[in-house]
Amino acid sequence: IRQANRYNFSGQYMQTPSPEDGGEWRKEWFRIMDKSEIPLQSLKWELIIDGAYTKDTKNDPSGFQIGAKWNNDYVILSSIDKYLEMPELLKFIPNHISSSGVDVKLTLVEPKASGKSLVQIIRQQTNINISEIKTIFVNSSKIENARACSHFIEGGRVILVKGAWNEPFLHQIAVFPNG
């Protein structure tokens, strides 16, 4: 039963919404490296934002991930969630970029929820290079998107820069899509 359906086993027998080591993606598929092992300053960093409208913790938070391609891998410098309304979000983004310690070349925003407005306002009020994400994945479900890149992640091609954000991130990965 455990191998036939990992989610059913976790839910019925373990009383948890997702398998402990992960469902769609597994924790062990991600490598964690110290920032001293990665040429941080030579990479082209991008901030990816999945925005939300509210501070209400019953809803999804806004997600912020700074990442870059490195050789054949993808490096995530940080990935955090915040419950922010639009005025706070507009202040947070430039501060988050400047405090990252790297040169963020491009900010990409999911064009849903607050995304379209966010791009327009940031363009008007700052010098941040910002754009809507334009891929076929924007119109797909979260599960479809996860499955589309699972082979890359399962192959150990995603590196997390060691930090306090790693454990909350890996927990979200493990409980996805049920957490």
Report residues per predicted region:
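Short, Φ-rich (hydrophobic/aromatic) sequence segments
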Residues: 1-2, 57, 172-176
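Generic structural signal for beta-strand residues in well-ordered domains
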Residues: 38-39, 57, 151
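Generic detector of ordered secondary-structure context
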Residues: 4-5, 56, 141
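An active-site-proximal beta-strand-loop segment
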Residues: 49-62
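Mg2+-dependent endonuclease catalytic cores in nucleic-acid-processing enzymes, primarily RNase H-like
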Residues: 16, 20, 24, 63-65, ...
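ATPase catalytic-site recognition across NTP-hydrolyzing enzymes
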Residues: 1-51
